[in-house]
């Protein structure tokens, strides 16, 4: 695979290999055949980051080869959304002959939605001033004249200039209901929107008929919490990053959801609060003991769950675990399988043509 060519004819073969690999990894814990969710074969990534290479009068996007570290020129990127591809050529055309926008530009980040909105961040090794803002506004207006719904941001050391806003609003059809998700520049969002829809619908399916409340750790912008709210009496969710918490609060209001409570704290702190080890000022007004959480949802970072959180989640009758790293999932399952068994297993092809796998398991108490 090269950045400008996807081996789409090999899509089914690479997916089949992942299914075999996941089944093999899960064999000590389950003999289930994974439910498999396919990605679009191209234009599936909603965000992308490129370094910018200056070559005489020319400049262009590059990425670095992971093995050789050599730079690769990228003029089109079929893994990314069609809007990102349109913007890549439009941004280079708009910056190439503009000394103010071009000077010391070293990276461009793109974030897009299925609803055809974009935030583009230009990163610089220089101070940004009013002249930069004026030139950036002219570029933004020229892009919008081409029917590109785009917001521009300038970044430099300790500097961030938003011309309008630093977010876009995604609209996803999830099990017959449109969900609105605010996505903030430089915060985590699901990279493959089509796959995100399938993940949300799978999570809804496996929690159908749930009793009681849901607890979610690492909720981000509320991606799963808000979609799953319809299956539970109440949802209590934790998140540590301030921009994600703010986006989650916006999303609760935008989706007219009244049974989700977001609290800003780390999973480790929440474990201490639940166990009565510590009291936290930011939990004032929230009666943790009033929640009857029968299900816990975790979507941890690549490192998986730490040992304290492992112990904590074992206290819940049902554990819904979305993993971006099956190796750490299996490590966690060595502990979790002592008290719980795997009821459902899914493979989500979030990153086609790569080694990476995303998967989901539903565990129920033995």
Swiss-Prot record:
Class of enzymatic activity (EC top level): transferase
Gene Ontology BP term (one): tRNA methylation
Active site location: 324 (nucleophile), 358 (proton acceptor)
Listed Pfam families: tRNA_U5-meth_tr
Binding-site residues for S-adenosyl-L-methionine, renumbered to this chain: 190, 218, 223, 239, 299
Reactions catalysed according to its record: uridine(54) in tRNA + S-adenosyl-L-methionine = 5-methyluridine(54) in tRNA + S-adenosyl-L-homocysteine + H(+); uridine(341) in tmRNA + S-adenosyl-L-methionine = 5-methyluridine(341) in tmRNA + S-adenosyl-L-homocysteine + H(+)
CDD domains: AdoMet_MTases
InterPro entries named among the record's database cross-references: MeTrfase_TrmA_AS, MeTrfase_TrmA_CS, SAM-dependent_MTases_sf, TrmA_MeTrfase, U5_MeTrfase_fam
CC terms in the record's Gene Ontology section: cytosol
EC number of this enzyme: 2.1.1.-, 2.1.1.35
UniProt-listed Gene3D superfamilies: 2.40.50.1070, Vaccinia Virus protein VP39
GO terms, molecular function: rRNA binding; tRNA (uracil(54)-C5)-methyltransferase activity, S-adenosyl methionine-dependent; tRNA binding
Keyword set, alphabetical order: Methyltransferase, S-adenosyl-L-methionine, Transferase, tRNA processing
Summary of the function given for this chain in its UniProt record: Dual-specificity methyltransferase that catalyzes the formation of 5-methyluridine at position 54 (m5U54) in all tRNAs, and that of position 341 (m5U341) in tmRNA (transfer-mRNA).
Entry similarity comment: Belongs to the class I-like SAM-binding methyltransferase superfamily. RNA M5U methyltransferase family. TrmA subfamily.
Protein name per the record: tRNA/tmRNA (uracil-C(5))-methyltransferase
Species, as recorded: Escherichia coli O7:K1 (strain IAI39 / ExPEC)
Organism taxonomic ancestry: Bacteria, Pseudomonadati, Pseudomonadota, Gammaproteobacteria, Enterobacterales
Gene that encodes the chain: trmA
């Amino acid at each position: 695979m090269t950045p400008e060519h996807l081996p789409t004819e090999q899509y089914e073969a690479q997916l089949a290999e992942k299914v075999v690999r996941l089944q093999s990894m899960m064999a000590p814990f389950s003999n289930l055949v994974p439910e498999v969710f396919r990605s679009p074969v191209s234009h599936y990534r909603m965000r992308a980051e490129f370094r910018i290479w200056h070559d005489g009068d020319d400049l262009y996007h590059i990425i670095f080869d992971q093995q050789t570290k050599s730079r690769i020129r990228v003029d089109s990127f079929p893994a990314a959304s069609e809007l990102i591809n349109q913007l890549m050529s439009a941004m280079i055309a708009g910056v190439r002959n503009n000394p103010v926008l071009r000077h010391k530009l070293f990276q461009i980040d793109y974030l897009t939605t299925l609803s055809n909105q974009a935030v583009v961040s230009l990163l610089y090794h220089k101070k940004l001033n009013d002249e930069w803002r004026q030139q950036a506004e002219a570029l933004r207006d020229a892009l919008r004249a081409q029917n590109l719904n785009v917001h521009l941001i300038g970044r430099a050391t300790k500097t961030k200039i938003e011309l309008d806003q630093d977010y876009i609003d995604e609209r996803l059809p999830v099990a017959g209901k449109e969900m609105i998700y605010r996505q903030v520049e430089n915060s985590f969002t699901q990279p493959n929107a089509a796959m995100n829809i399938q993940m949300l619908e799978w999570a809804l399916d496996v929690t159908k008929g749930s009793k009681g409340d849901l607890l979610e750790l690492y909720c981000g912008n509320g991606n799963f919490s808000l979609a799953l709210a319809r299956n539970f009496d109440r949802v209590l969710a934790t998140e540590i990053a301030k921009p994600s918490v703010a986006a989650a609060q916006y999303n609760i209001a935008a989706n007219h959801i009244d049974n989700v409570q977001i609290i800003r704290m780390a999973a480790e702190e929440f474990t201490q609060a639940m166990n009565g080890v510590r009291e936290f000022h930011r939990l004032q007004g929230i009666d943790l003991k009033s929640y009857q959480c029968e299900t816990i949802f975790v979507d941890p970072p690549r490192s998986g769950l730490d040992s304290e959180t492992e112990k904590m989640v074992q206290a819940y009758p049902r554990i819904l675990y979305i993993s971006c790293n099956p190796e750490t999932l299996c490590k966690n399952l060595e502990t979790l399988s002592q008290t719980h068994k795997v009821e459902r297993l899914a493979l989500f092809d979030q990153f086609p043509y790569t080694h990476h796998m995303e998967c989901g398991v539903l565990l129920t108490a033995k």
